[in-house]
């Protein structure tokens, strides 16, 4: 009887110990389950972060593509601007050549004008000489007339001298008319040269204005090129910053993937512990 009683007490103690272990295992199982749910929640949160990181990465890639397109467009504009500057440079060079030709023509015209002025001065001196000769002939004619009045006996000689004086006077008048014609031609030539000089002066002023406008356009093109260069540098900086952001996001994605892999390993280990716990409970 004592043996049965002891055995029953031992069985009762063993039952109590088993119940206590069952309670402990249930609490342990509950903790493991809570930990598993927590890990699953963390994994879900990590998946959400990974999706958001992927979305951010896609947006950054789109932004990078847009920046690359803008950079390409900026390069095209810069190329076009350089072509325009080259064209303006060629045009300025041609204008400079035209200006040199015009200057040469102006020099030739001034030389011709100076020669015409000298010719006009010579014609004026000739005209004055003719006038002096004409006055002298008139005085001589008067003298002959006085001599004719004073000495009729030498009338024939006086008539001859008179005829000679008249002939010289006619020659002088013809020379005078020729001198006047040459003077008028010289004056007309001077007027023509002055008109040509005025036209050349106007052309030179027009060339100077065109050159100033070309210089202004060239300055505008240089300013545009500087602006495009600054915009290109800004685009390159933005592209570099975008690449840095992409690299940073890629590192974050890599870290998240590593964390996810570690969580999966922990979840796998936790599942193994739970399976082992269930096996131990089932064994009891």
UniProtKB/Swiss-Prot annotation:
InterPro entries the UniProt entry points to: Tropomyosin (IPR000533)
Domain of life the protein comes from: Eukaryota
Coiled-coil annotated spans: 1-284
Region Disordered: start-end pairs: 111-131
One Pfam family hit: Tropomyosin
Stated role: Tropomyosin, in association with the troponin complex, plays a central role in the calcium dependent regulation of muscle contraction.
Entry similarity comment: Belongs to the tropomyosin family.
Domain description: The molecule is in a coiled coil structure that is formed by 2 polypeptide chains. The sequence exhibits a prominent seven-residues periodicity.
Subunit structure: Homodimer.
Name listed for the protein in its UniProt record: Tropomyosin
Organism: Schistosoma haematobium
